[in-house]
Amino acid sequence: MSASQLQRLLITAAAVALAGCGASQTGGVDATVWQAVERGDVAAMAKNLGGPSLANATNVAGNSPLYEAVGSPDLAVARLLLAKGADANQRNQFGRTPLHRAADEDRLEVVRLLLAKGADVNARDCRGSTPLIAAAEFASLPVLELLVEAGADVATGNHYGRSALHNAAKREDPAVTKFLIAHGARLNQICEYGTPLDLTANSGIADVLRAVGGSESATRSIASRTHKHYLTELPLTK
């Protein structure tokens, strides 16, 4: 695991714990199947997956085999699980679906597959974030384009008001920022850290936002006033 991935994991865990939205874990995935998913061993999975009950079981982290298969380099793993009855919309203990993970990990073909199999493009996790909101922080433009084409709500925010545009501005990606604006992002929506303009330290992104009517919030939070620090680490207190 890279340092950036570890940081993301710790940030997500801390935020979810503070939000109090964890759920109790249920089920228990068969060890043979679980090992096959980890190895990307399609043959072993085909042999040991008896049907939907195993395909939709959960491990100790509350994740389904399909959720874990999103990380496999072999798309055949996810295809087999779906063919065996895996639920494309099954949530883990944080309310995240396989599409949330595929979107924020920039797995374009997995996103395409999940959408084709009925994944809810506007599913909300326990913090209210949709796959598009997650993707805007980490994924490449083609993933966002695919989600929007499938009906993702560009303007929506999570439970704290944070939208895809907030994440794109924080990330400092001009192409993603312009794409979201062109598809109806709300320029001055306020989240706990202010408006999208409050969250960028990049003059180019700031110019793009101002040119179409973006502005800083009138009453900016402590976090938004120190957003340069926020770019690298979410504060654990509000």
Residue ranges of predicted features:
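Bacterial N-terminal signal peptides that target proteins for export
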Residues: 1-10
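Ankyrin-repeat-protein effector appendages
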Residues: 21-32, 150, 183, 191-192, ...
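N-terminal segments that cap or nucleate solenoid repeat domains
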Residues: 25-68
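Ankyrin repeat A-helix N-terminal signature
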Residues: 35-40, 68-74, 101-107, 134-140, ...
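Ankyrin repeat structural motif
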Residues: 41-49, 74-82, 107-115, 140-148, ...
